[in-house]
């Protein structure tokens, strides 16, 4: 799913970039199974690139730079649809994954149970 640059710009003006580094929270969810795959941060540029290219982009809080999810691994996340929360400070992207999402090689970043950590 892609929006025009004009549509993306209008939508971005309605968002509230209030989190660290002027970001919103971005949740990736499998578009078929609805499994939560990962959570990241997006600044205005990341949202714009995501909406206009159809490929998920994030803002790296640690590296302070934009990154295309899958640019190194080839495991791109293709946007099928998206939703915006009631406050406008978070988005859920329903995605089609090209390979595992997590850098560990797991399909989802949410693969650990609490018992694994205690």
Swiss-Prot record:
Q: Tell me the route in metabolism or biology where this protein functions.
A: Amino-acid biosynthesis; L-histidine biosynthesis; L-histidine from 5-phospho-alpha-D-ribose 1-diphosphate: step 3/9
Instruction: Report residues binding Zn(2+).
Output: 86, 102, 109
The chemistry this enzyme catalyses reads: 1-(5-phospho-beta-D-ribosyl)-5'-AMP + H2O = 1-(5-phospho-beta-D-ribosyl)-5-[(5-phospho-beta-D-ribosylamino)methylideneamino]imidazole-4-carboxamide
Under which EC number(s) is this enzyme classified? 3.5.4.19
Recorded GO terms, molecular function? magnesium ion binding; phosphoribosyl-AMP cyclohydrolase activity; zinc ion binding
Superkingdom to which the source organism belongs: Archaea
Amino acids binding Mg(2+): 85, 87, 89
UniProt xrefs under Pfam families: PRA-CH
The cofactors required by this protein are:
Mg(2+); Zn(2+)
The record describes how the cofactor is bound as: Binds 1 Mg(2+) ion per subunit.
Locations listed in the record = Cytoplasm
Keywords of the record, alphabetical order, are: Amino-acid biosynthesis, Cytoplasm, Histidine biosynthesis, Hydrolase, Magnesium, Metal-binding, Zinc
Listed under GO biological process in this entry are: L-histidine biosynthetic process
Which cellular components does GO assign to this protein? cytoplasm
Give the matching SUPFAM superfamilies: HisI-like (SSF141734)
Assembly and partners? Homodimer.
Please describe what this protein does.
Answer: Catalyzes the hydrolysis of the adenine ring of phosphoribosyl-AMP.
Give the similarity note: Belongs to the PRA-CH family.
Protein name stated in the entry: Phosphoribosyl-AMP cyclohydrolase
Q: Which organism is it from?
A: Sulfurisphaera tokodaii (strain DSM 16993 / JCM 10545 / NBRC 100140 / 7) (Sulfolobus tokodaii)
